[in-house]
């Protein structure tokens, strides 16, 4: 493994050897962008690696801070991966305005939830029960649920979000955002990084909450 970047991101070169370099480079850069934005999450991203993921999964993030890129998808040419991802945005599966670079941005968004668990749960102690509580919060998307609830309230106070129900705010980001609150948070992060102030009102609100908590 090779340590790259000022935050100590480990790139598992052997596991990524069959993937297209530019696709991997873009993913690593996307993750570092998030780490730059959120100092409290810097020590929680431990590894970028490749693996054979189940059919249809482009990438994933684990509680242990590992982001895994699918060998099947990231071994494609840049244009090939672009076409695949653009097909998902055309269907509304992922936020409009995002591209293949935001695959890793989405996964880094999950690591931000892990940082919230560290801040609000694991910081209370290092005993077994505390560790179990942290893992349970990850499994149940407890912290992302709290972020989304607050962000929905904030979004409804804006002209763009006024009068919208929570479900409508979430669905406006993407259909994938409706899966669960962890995916809502990650999709909002990708939406904001891609579109900035022009992102959906919920995404703008989620970003503001995360910046307050972890920035």
Regions found by a protein language model. Name each.
Residues 2-215:
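Active-site-flanking segments in enzyme catalytic domains
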């Amino acid at each position: 493994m090779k340590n790259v970047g000022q935050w100590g991101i480990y790139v598992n070169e052997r596991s990524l050897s069959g993937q297209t370099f530019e696709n991997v480079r873009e993913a690593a850069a996307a993750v570092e962008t998030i780490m730059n934005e959120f100092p409290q999450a810097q020590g929680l991203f431990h590894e970028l690696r490749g693996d054979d993921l189940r059919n249809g999964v482009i990438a994933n993030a684990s509680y242990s801070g590992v982001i895994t890129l699918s060998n099947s998808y990231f071994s494609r040419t840049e244009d090939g991966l672009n076409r695949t991802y653009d097909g998902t945005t055309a269907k509304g599966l992922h936020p409009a305005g995002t591209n293949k670079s935001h695959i890793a941005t989405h996964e880094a968004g999950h690591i931000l939830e892990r940082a919230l668990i560290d801040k609000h749960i694991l910081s209370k102690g290092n005993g077994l029960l505390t560790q179990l509580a942290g893992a349970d919060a990850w499994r149940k998307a407890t912290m992302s649920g709290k972020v989304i609830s607050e962000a929905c309230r904030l979004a409804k106070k804006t002209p763009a979000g006024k009068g919208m129900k929570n479900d409508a705010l979430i669905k406006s980001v993407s259909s994938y955002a409706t899966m669960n609150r962890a995916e809502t948070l990650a999709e909002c992060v990708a939406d904001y990084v891609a579109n900035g102030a022009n992102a959906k009102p919920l995404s703008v609100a989620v970003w503001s909450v995360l910046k307050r908590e972890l920035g």
